Amino acid sequence: MSGIGRTRSITLAGLRGEVVHVEADIAQSLPGFTLLGLPDQALQESRDRIRSAARNAGLPLTRRHLTVNLLPAGVHKRGACHDLAIVLAAYAADGRVRNVEGPVFLAELGLDGALHLSLIHI
């Protein structure tokens, strides 16, 4: 059963941290991965990094179309620190994990699925 998966991360807005709400939706259409919400280049690259990490960790993402929205839409999101929040939102949308809406997730994923400390960039 699919629905909307939700998690949270953090980005810098000027000199203050701002909570990023991560929403994931899985559609019954051709495979793909759309990332919305003013992501920078490193975050755009997370689509391939997250798919590879999930597959190599033995927990592949859905083969359907995944849309991820990062809110608030008007705030630029920087860096790979949102990887973990995105993959957990995708798993929640697919019904594979529960209770991930409360915590803030802040980590980069390696291609092997390992978690890496990821600093928030100004």
List the predicted regions and their residue ranges.
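Peripheral, non-AAA+ core regions of ATP-driven protein-machinery
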Residues: 1-121
